[in-house]
Amino acid sequence: SAVDLLAATGVRGLRLKKEAGIERVYVNDASSTAFALMKQNAKLNKLKLFISNLRAHEFLAVRHKAKDKKFGYVDIDPFGTPVPFLDAGVKAIVENRGGIIAVTATDTSALCGTYPDACLRKYGAKPLYTYLMNEAGLRILIKKVQEVAAQYDIALTPLFAHTTRHYMRCFLQAARGADKADKILQQIGCFQGAGPMWLGKLWDEPLVEKMFRLTF
């Protein structure tokens, strides 16, 4: 199953259902306008989605009471920083079967060093304001998500990550275990006056090669 916690029009959920063939897809948004659009778009595409009109935390709180309360894929794509949604988000992943969490950040002015104090407050790291700022910001974002997950003995390994125009996005695969989480944290450090940030690989090479072959 998959959930898009801040789904807006629901297009990502529709694609997960139609293109990826995921059986149970949940789309949620606190906006009543978005809720109406999600229902309309699902109807136009003749697809069954589980559509809700709740705040992200409320949705996860309700789901926590359900038998199948966790998801194989959790998508967090807010306007601005994803930090307020990370704690509930990582706890919603099916961590013992390789669940994936996708996180987007659009507050690139903080992550890329224009507002370093904001980056320090939100992400607990000092950014770079140089030609390396995009990669450094992406690594700071990944670090933040990993730290939140590690509190619950969940290790998050990057599958794919990128920066594009006004946003940064990362896909991280979960594994249960304190030892595994510790190994992830050991790959977090500082770099020439910036950090702490994720110092490991930004993507899984075999996966990216396969993506490239399928695309081109």
Language model features: what each stretch is:
Residues S1-F216:
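SAM-dependent transferase fold signal centered on methyltransferase-like domains
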